Each structure stands twice: as C-alpha cells, then as structure tokens.
C-alpha cells in the first residue's frame, strides 16, 4: 500500500484556543489547508477545525479568491485575481470590524505577493542561499487598507560576507521583476522607493543588522523619521526563519536602548490628535478636513511600535502590540479595550472613505459624520491622546 508520507499534510499549522474563527479562516486561506490544529496554552492538542466548520455562504468568496490566486499562471490572471480581492474587500467594509477587514486584505494580498514571487522566480536562476521577501509598513502590520502601495525588501545569507555584493546583483533583477508584477496587480511602486528592487533594501543579514544598528544609534530624532516602517517587518516568501532571526536580534538590541526609544517617542509625540479647546476638532484651514491617518491611526501605530520594541513584543500588528503591552504593563482591561476600539473606529472611517472615493484618501469632513459617529471619533482621539501620555522613556 501507499506510505502515509505520500498522502499526509506536512508543516502543520496551529492556532491557540483563544484565536477567533476569523483568524482561523484566514490561516486556512493563507496556507491553503483543509484543517487546522488547535492547541491550548501549554501547546497541547485541543482539537481540529476544518474548512467545513468555518466557511459559510457569507464567507465562500474567500475560498473562491484563494483558488483564483493559486490558479493564476501568468501576470494577467494574477492581476485579475488581485482586482477581485479589492472589490471583495470594498464590499466587506460594512460587514466587519476594521481589524478583521484589514487583516483579511493583508492575508489575501500575501497570497498575491507569494504568487508574484513564484511567477518572477520562474524567470530567473536565483542563488542557492537562504533568502526571504520582507513586507514593511502596513502590510508588515497586517493593516493594509483599500488604498495601498508596496513596501518590501529582501534579506539573504551569503556563505561568505565576501559574496554579498555578487549575490545582491543576482537578486536585484528578480526583485525588480516582482516589483513590476505587483505594480501590474494594483500595488503601485513605492514613492519613497522602499522596494526590494532598490539595492538599499536588498541586503544580507549582516547588512540589515548594521542598518538597524545605525538607526538605533542615531544622533537626533530627525534621523529616524523615515525609518519607522522598517521596524514593522514581516516575512512573506522564501525562508521565513530569516525574518524571525532578524526580529529576535532587533528586539534583543532595542529594548535596553533608552536613547533610541526616547527619540522614537519624541517623533511620535510631534503631532497630537486634532482636538480643539473651543471646537470639537481642529481641521485643516484650507480644506476643512481631518486627516484620519496622520492625526489618528498613526498615533496608535507609532505608540504600539515603540511599546513593542521596549517590551520585546514580537507581534507586528498594532492591536496585537497594544494587547501585549497592556498585559505586560498591567493596564486595566477597560483601558486596553477602549484603546483598541478607538483605533478600530478610525480605521473603519478610513476604509469607508476609501471605498466611497468621495475625496482625498484618509481625509474626512466632520460634517459628514452623524451625531453618534461624531461623538465616537472625538472619544477615539481622546484615547489617542491618552496613549501618547504613556510614552514616557
């Protein structure tokens, strides 16, 4: 008879008992699995969950999209599948929390990136050394919205440091091709050129450590202004253990670097939420609009990043970082919940605005809100201000 090794599923993916059904659906989609292992707090087997258990008619579009992405054998087909993801995401904006919608978008976008890497890799003969495709910024945090560009890089490990430049020149044409494929799939080139096809962000493990060490030894807070998105990196394709190794090194070196953390906090505190003493909101003088990203969600993202680096938290998502920080610092549960709900509400408004395409992305007129939304946004900004007050280093 056939050996069990020929029919078994390797690389078992597990989730804790505390994981939501939504997280389980996303894990099934991302890894193209039929079953997930559920473990308890000690890591012991607690049960199994299957696609049949989790998928309803309301969520079948996930399976359809996953199948379309996996079936794409050329750029045109992949671009069409990516377009379908964005259309489905726009429909989901009113159905779930912003955290779930953004995570749903990011996971499916991960599959698009994986397919883009596979398509590009078939065109090149890559070096036989470990390498990993990294996502930075919102994709690294699992917080991509409907309006997003690409921020990515490569980390590789040469057999000898002398081979670094030669290997980089081997990886760059491949990386640029992936960037081109992603652009064709609706992920525009990064305006700041934070892409793997840029030699600055196609680095060896040693070079990445040197890059982070340089940022962590900056002379002024200004030197860090354009570096923050790199501290949200996450593995997408290739040898994912390289990203884990780099993150372990980063957390080991960032937590006790008080000057670096103070500089990060100083930058995070440069702009506060747009709350007025007389009026409810301080809007832009010319447009009369609020910038929900710059003056809202950014505050939560920046604070969560700093707390994660200070406390050694490996989670890259803002909500996960705040949850972990709250547990480690003993924040009352109601404070953590209020903070998470405030961030989610601002993200929900951003998603709604991007779906409606009624004006500039991430900007909103207070007059467009109903009375309840107006009050909720005001309280969300207050929660942002409270969170900023916790950044004392």
Residue ranges and their predicted role:
Residues 10, 39, 156:
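Conserved residues at the C-terminal ends of beta-strands
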Residues 52-66:
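Sensory coupling linkers of modular signal transduction proteins
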Residues 64-393:
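A nucleotide- and high-energy phosphate-metabolite-utilizing enzyme signature
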Residues 14-33, 39-40:
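The conserved cystathionine-beta-synthase
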Residues 20, 53-54, 149:
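Histidine- and aromatic-rich ligand-binding microenvironments
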Residues 1-12, 149:
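Bateman (tandem CBS) regulatory domains
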Residues 1, 7, 28, 36-54:
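A glycine-centered beta-loop-beta connector
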């Amino acid at each position: 008879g056939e050996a069990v090794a020929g029919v078994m599923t390797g690389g078992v993916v597990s989730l804790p008992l505390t994981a939501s059904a939504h997280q389980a659906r996303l894990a099934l989609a991302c890894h193209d699995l039929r079953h997930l292992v559920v473990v308890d707090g000690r890591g012991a087997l607690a049960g199994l969950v299957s696609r049949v258990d989790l998928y309803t008619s309301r969520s079948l579009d996930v399976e359809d999209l996953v199948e379309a992405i996996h079936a794409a054998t050329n750029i045109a087909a992949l671009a069409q599948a990516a377009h379908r993801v964005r259309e489905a995401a726009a429909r989901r904006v009113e159905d779930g929390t912003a955290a779930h919608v953004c995570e749903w978008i990011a996971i499916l976008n991960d599959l698009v990136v994986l397919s883009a890497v596979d398509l590009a890799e078939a065109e090149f003969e890559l070096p036989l050394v470990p390498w990993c495709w990294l996502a930075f910024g919102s994709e690294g945090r699992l917080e991509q919205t409907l309006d997003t560009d690409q921020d990515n890089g490569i980390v590789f490990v040469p057999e000898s440091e002398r081979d670094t430049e030669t290997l980089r020149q081997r990886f760059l044409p491949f990386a640029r091709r992936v960037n081109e494929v992603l652009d064709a799939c609706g992920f525009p080139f990064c305006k700041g050129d934070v892409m793997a096809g840029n030699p600055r962000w196609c680095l060896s493990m040693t070079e990445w450590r040197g890059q982070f060490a340089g940022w962590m030894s900056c002379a002024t807070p200004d030197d860090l202004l354009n570096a923050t998105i790199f501290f949200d990196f996450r593995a997408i394709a290739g040898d994912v253990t390289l990203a884990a190794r780099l993150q372990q090194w980063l957390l080991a070196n960032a937590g006790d670097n008080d000057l670096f953390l103070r500089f990060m906090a100083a930058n995070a505190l440069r702009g506060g939420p747009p709350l007025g003493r007389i009026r409810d909101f301080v809007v832009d003088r010319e447009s009369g609009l609020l910038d929900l990203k710059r003056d809202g969600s950014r505050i939560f993202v920046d604070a969560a990043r700093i707390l994660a680096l200070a406390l050694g938290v490996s989670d890259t998502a803002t909500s996960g970082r705040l949850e972990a920080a709250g547990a480690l610092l003993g924040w009352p549960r109601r404070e953590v919940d209020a903070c998470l709900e405030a961030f989610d509400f601002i993200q929900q408004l951003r998603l709604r605005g991007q779906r409606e395409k009624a004006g500039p992305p991430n900007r909103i007129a207070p007059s467009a809100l109903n009375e309840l939304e107006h009050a909720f946004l005001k309280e969300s900004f207050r929660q942002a201000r409270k969170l900023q007050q916790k950044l004392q280093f």
